[in-house]
C-alpha cells in the first residue's frame, strides 16, 4: 500500500498537461506568424517556410515555450488542488452529495466513508477487492464502502464494458454481487461473462440490456470526478481525509482506519 497526499499523486496528469501546453504554445506561435503577415503574404507562405520561421523563433527565444508550459502547468495544478480541497471538504460536510447514486455497502450510515476508485480490468483492483471484502466482514457496522468507476480505457479495453454491465446490475440492486463476480473472473471479461453473470443473478435481462446503454452518463461523472482530482491510476482510496493507493493489505487499511477513528 502507498500512503499519499492527494495533491501529489498524479505526475502523469501534469506531464499530460505540459504536453498540452507545448502544443498550445506552438499553435499560438503559428497564429502570431500569420497575424504578422499581410493577407497576400499569408496566402503565398508554404508550410515548410512557416515551420522554419517557427523554429527560428524557438531557437532565439526558447524561454517563451518554457514559460508558457510552466504557466499552464501551474494553472492546471492550482485547479486540481482546488478540486481536491473542495472534494475533501464536501466529504466531511456533505457526505451524501459526494456519494450520490454510487453503490454503497457496509455500514451505510457510518461516519467513516471509504471511497474506492476502481477498474474491473485492473489486476491491482482485483487484489484490493479481496482485501476490502475481508475489511467489511471483519469490521461490520464501522465502514461505508463506496464504489466509483474509473475505467482506464487506454490500457484496459474491457474496463468500460464491464463497468456498464456492473452499473446495469446496480439498477436491479445487484451491484456488489456483480462486482464480486467480475473481479473473481477477471481473466474472462467479455460479453459471454457479462451475460452469464446476469443470468446467474436472475436479473431481468431486457432491463439489463437497456440499462447498459444508459450507463455511460453515470460512469462519465465518476471519471470526471477522478480526473478533476488528478487521479491517473487505480485502485485509489479516500477514507475520510486519508488517501492511499495500490493493492492494499488488510493490516494497512486497518492502520488507516485506526488513525481516522482517533482524529
Give residue ranges: language-model regions:
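Bacterial N-terminal signal peptides that target proteins for export
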Residues: 3-8, 14-26
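Alpha-helical and His/Cys-centered functional microenvironments
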Residues: 9, 31, 65
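Aromatic (phenylalanine/tyrosine) cluster motif
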Residues: 13-14, 34
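Intrinsically disordered, low-complexity serine/threonine-rich segments
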Residues: 16-17, 37-40, 250, 254
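Bacterial N-terminal signal peptides
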Residues: 25-35
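Extracytoplasmic thiol/disulfide redox context detector
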Residues: 40-154, 213-228, 233, 262-263
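Cysteine-centric redox/oxidoreductase cores and disulfide-bonded domains
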Residues: 152-263
Amino acid at each position: 500500500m502507498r500512503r499519499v497526499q492527494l495533491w501529489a499523486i498524479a505526475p502523469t496528469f501534469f506531464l499530460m498537461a505540459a504536453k498540452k501546453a507545448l502544443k498550445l504554445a506552438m499553435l499560438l506561435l503559428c497564429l502570431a506568424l500569420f497575424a504578422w503577415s499581410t493577407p497576400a503574404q499569408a496566402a503565398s507562405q508554404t508550410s515548410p517556410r512557416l515551420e522554419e520561421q517557427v523554429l527560428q523563433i524557438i531557437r532565439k527565444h526558447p524561454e517563451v515555450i518554457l514559460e508558457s508550459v510552466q504557466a499552464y502547468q501551474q494553472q492546471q495544478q492550482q485547479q486540481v488542488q482546488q478540486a481536491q480541497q473542495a472534494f475533501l471538504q464536501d466529504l466531511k460536510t456533505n457526505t451524501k452529495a459526494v456519494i450520490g447514486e454510487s453503490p454503497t455497502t457496509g455500514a451505510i450510515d457510518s461516519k467513516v466513508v471509504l471511497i474506492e476508485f476502481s477498474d474491473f480490468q485492473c489486476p491491482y483492483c482485483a487484489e484490493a477487492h479481496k482485501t476490502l471484502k475481508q475489511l467489511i466482514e471483519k469490521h461490520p457496522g464501522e465502514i461505508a464502502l463506496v464504489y466509483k468507476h474509473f475505467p482506464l480505457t487506454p490500457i484496459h479495453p474491457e474496463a468500460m464494458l464491464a463497468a456498464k454491465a456492473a452499473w446495469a446490475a446496480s439498477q436491479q440492486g445487484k451491484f456488489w454481487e456483480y462486482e464480486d463476480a467480475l473481479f473473481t473472473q477477471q481473466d474472462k471479461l467479455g460479453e459471454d461473462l457479462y451475460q452469464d453473470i446476469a443470468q446467474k443473478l436472475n436479473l431481468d435481462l431486457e432491463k439489463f440490456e437497456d440499462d447498459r446503454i444508459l450507463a455511460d452518463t453515470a460512469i462519465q461523472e465518476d471519471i470526471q470526478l477522478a480526473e478533476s482530482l488528478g487521479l491517473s491510476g487505480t485502485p485509489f482510496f479516500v477514507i475520510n481525509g486519508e488517501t492511499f493507493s495500490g493493492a492494499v493489505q488488510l493490516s494497512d487499511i486497518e492502520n488507516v482506519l485506526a488513525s481516522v477513528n482517533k482524529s
